[in-house]
A protein has these predicted regions:
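Short, Lys/Arg-enriched N-terminal segments with co-localized hydrophobic residues
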Residues: 3-12
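Short acidic-hydrophobic surface loop/beta-edge motif
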Residues: 8, 19, 31, 125-129
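Conserved beta-strand hairpin/beta-sheet module of binuclear metal-dependent hydrolase folds
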Residues: 13-56, 148-155
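Structural signal for conserved beta-strand scaffold positions within catalytic alpha/beta enzyme cores
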Residues: 18-20, 89, 120, 136-138
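Short solvent-exposed loop/turn micro-motifs enriched in small/polar/acidic residues
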Residues: 22-24, 112-114, 118-120, 140-144
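Divalent metal-coordination and catalytic microenvironments
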Residues: 31, 42, 67, 121, ...
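Metallo-beta-lactamase
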Residues: 38, 46, 103-106, 110, ...
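Active-site HxH/HxHxD metal-binding segment of metal-dependent hydrolases
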Residues: 45-128
Length: 155
């Protein structure tokens, strides 16, 4: 079940949807952007993300991974293959994206699929994805590359 984190504004700007996904109920966020293309943050399950996108008439444009634990990117490889979406991920955790042992995949009941980000980002960087501007704030502790993402919806 998805939960809208923000309600639609009067000018019909997009919502931010929160979906608890995968074996651990990891929070995934889906933000509709320009041209019905969505940004998906921390996709723990490709099948559930694809079902949500299809139900809401959205196409996947960009995947963002906030840190290197597998429960936050378990669905990313499949989504990249099936949609051609680009992948952005936190740079300090780069080694975790290709190692089952480093990203704790051994503790999950799904097959490990490594990812290769198209772009790695660092604390303080800004980027645009599907017409949405994001600012990265490093939040090391959970992992060295854990980060927060800030965006303004509708202004």
């Amino acid at each position: 079940m998805s939960v809208p984190v923000s309600s639609k504004k009067e000018n019909d700007m997009p919502q931010i949807y929160q979906l608890p996904l995968g074996a651990l109920g990891t929070n995934c966020y889906i933000i509709p952007g320009e041209d019905s293309r969505a940004v998906v943050i921390d996709p723990a399950s490709a099948a559930e993300v694809e079902m949500f996108l299809n139900t809401h008439g959205l196409k996947l444009g960009t995947i963002i991974v906030t840190h290197g634990h597998y429960d936050h990117f378990a669905g990313a490889a499949q989504l990249m293959e099936s949609t051609g979406a680009s992948l952005l991920a936190s740079a300090p955790d780069e080694a975790m994206y290709s190692s089952a042992a480093k990203c704790w995949a051994d503790f999950m009941p799904v097959e490990f699929r490594p990812i290769k980000p198209d772009k790695l980002f660092l604390d303080g960087e800004e980027f645009t994805a599907e017409g949405l501007k994001f600012r990265v704030m490093g939040a090391p502790g959970h992992t060295a590359g854990s980060c927060l993402l800030f965006t303004e919806i509708g202004g």
